[in-house]
Amino acid sequence: IGHYHVTGPALAHVYKTLRANDPGSRLVAFVAASGSAGTLGAGDWLKDKFAAEIVTVEALECPTMLYNGYGEHNIQGIGDKHIPLIHNVLNTDGVVGISDQATDGLNLVFNTKIGKDYLKSKLGVDPAIVDQLTHFGFSSIANMLAAIKTAKSLDLGPEEVLISVATDGSELYTSEKEKLLAANYAGGFTKQQAGEIASRYLMGADTEHVQQLDVVARERIFNLGYYTWVEQQGVSIEDFEIRRSAAFWDALHKMAPVWDELIGEFNGRTGVGV
C-alpha cells in the first residue's frame, strides 16, 4: 500500500518530468525484482494511471516464476523459492530471469577503477553516469538488466519508456566484491576482463529467459503460492483465493486514508504528532 501511494506517484513524477521535455514519450512498463513484492505495488499504480505493464525480475539460478524452478543465488535482497502473499500476480505482465553471474560481474565493473575507466574510455559512457553507478547494488543491477531485456523483447523504440528503481547500493556488497576479486582475479582485475564482463552481460543482454504472461501463466504462478501460504503458513484458503479478485486489491489500496487517520489519532494521544 505504501509503494502504491508513495513510490508509484514518485516514479510518475519522474516520468512526467521526462515527458515535459519529450511530449511524444510513452510509459510502457515498470520493471522490478519481486523480493517481498512490496515495490511491485508501484507498478500497480503506474498500470492504473498509465496502463503500464508490470514486469517482475527473479534470479535465473532460482527461476520460480519462469520455470517453477528452485536453487541458490547471490542476488541478495530479491527473495526466492516462493510467491509473496502481497504480490498481485494476476496483474503482472512479464517475468525476466537474470543470472547472479551478471550482477556479481557488473558490480566489479561499476565499482573498481579498472572497470570505471573501461566504461569511460572504451564505451564512451559519460563520467557523471559512471559516478552514479555506485548506487547500483545487486538487485538494482538486476533491475537494469531486466529493463534492457524487456526493451529488446518488446522491440521498443526511442519514444517508449521503461521505468525501474535502484533498490540498493553497492556499499552493501563491498565484502562480496572483495571475495570475488580474491577468488577469481587474484592476479589483478584487468581492463580486458572488465570488457569481457560488460560485453557479455551489459551489451550482450538478450531476450533469453523473458516470458510475457498470458492468463494460463499468471494462474500457474498464482497457484504456486498455495504451498507456501496455505499448506505451510496456515493462511486460510478463503484468504488465499480472494487475492485473485481485482476488487480485493482495489479495496486494499483505499485503506491508506484510514491508516493515515489512525496514525494521526495515535500521534495525538501519545503527544508525538507534528
Residues of each region from the PLM?
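Short glycine/serine/threonine-rich phosphate/pyrophosphate-binding segments
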Residues: 30-44, 64-65, 138-147, 173
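A glycine-rich, Thr/Ser-enriched phosphate-binding loop motif common to dinucleotide/cofactor-binding enzymes
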Residues: 1-11, 135-142
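Buried hydrophobic positions in well-ordered alpha/beta secondary-structure cores of metabolic enzymes
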Residues: 11, 30-31, 54, 95, ...
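Generic beta-strand/beta-sheet core signal
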Residues: 33, 57, 98, 165-167
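Phosphate/pyrophosphate-binding loops at sites that engage ATP/ADP/AMP, CoA/4′-phosphopantetheine
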Residues: 13-24, 151
